[in-house]
From Swiss-Prot:
Membrane-spanning residues: none
Name this protein carries in UniProt: 7-methyl-GTP pyrophosphatase
Subcellular location: Cytoplasm
Protein's organism: Nitrosospira multiformis (strain ATCC 25196 / NCIMB 11849 / C 71)
Pfam families linked to this entry: Maf
Top-level taxon of the source organism: Bacteria
Record family assignment: Belongs to the Maf family. YceF subfamily.
Classification lineage: Bacteria, Pseudomonadati, Pseudomonadota, Betaproteobacteria, Nitrosomonadales
Length: 198
């Protein structure tokens, strides 16, 4: 398999192995850098604005040590009935989140940002998805949490893994957005930056 060569260094600003795996699908060379940013929502900030701001902040954090690179940043926020569902961080919070959203619809906002640090230009896109969760029993929730431990996933939903079994149906323009990196939008952005994928 031959990988495409690109003129600028391409960097994925993420610690997520799932975003890295998604980007590898495009068969282009890239490096990974973990952006160390505060992901706390700002007071009064809407969930979609939070996602866009954090995706952009990740690219800027990486750009500080990688001048001249094309930097990809992404962030995802889940919302249920106007409430932002963050990363649960532990078993108890994950149980509560999944009990709250079982049988219900949750909106996921996945923001994508491509920062050209050589030209100081940014391209950004917000890709919304709606997910209807199955009406899960407490036993099913417990089984899922024991097997997957999705404590660092928005809404306790590790959709790139066993979390797919929690879904009754989903609506959205890009299925990869739910995993955290909307590849359809990314291909368009990279093409505009002169990176040929195919």
């Amino acid at each position: 398999m031959k990988t495409q060569q690109i003129a600028q260094q391409l960097i994925l600003g993420s610690s997520s192995i799932y975003r890295r795996d998604l980007l590898q699908r495009l068969q282009i060379p890239f490096d990974v850098s973990n952006p160390d940013i505060d992901e706390t929502p700002l007071p009064g900030e809407t969930p979609d604005a939070t996602a866009v701001r954090l995706a952009a902040a990740k690219t800027r954090a990486v750009a500080a040590t990688h001048p001249g690179a094309l930097i990809i940043g992404a962030d995802q926020v889940a919302v249920f009935e106007g409430i932002q569902l963050g990363k649960p961080l532990n078993h108890l919070n994950a149980t509560r989140q999944l009990q709250l959203i079982r049988g219900k619809e949750v909106s996921f906002y996945t923001a994508l940002c491509l920062f050209n640090s050589a030209q100081d230009t940014t391209r950004a896109r917000l890709v919304p998805s709606r997910v209807k969760f199955r009406l899960l029993s407490d036993r099913q929730i417990e089984n899922y949490l024991d097997k997957e431990q999705p404590y660092h996933c928005a809404a306790s939903s590790k959709l790139e893994g066993l979390g797919i079994a929690l879904i009754e149906h989903m609506e959205g323009e890009d299925p990869t957005a739910l995993i955290g990196l909307p590849l359809i939008a990314l291909v368009e952005m990279l093409t505009l930056e002169g990176v040929e994928i195919v």
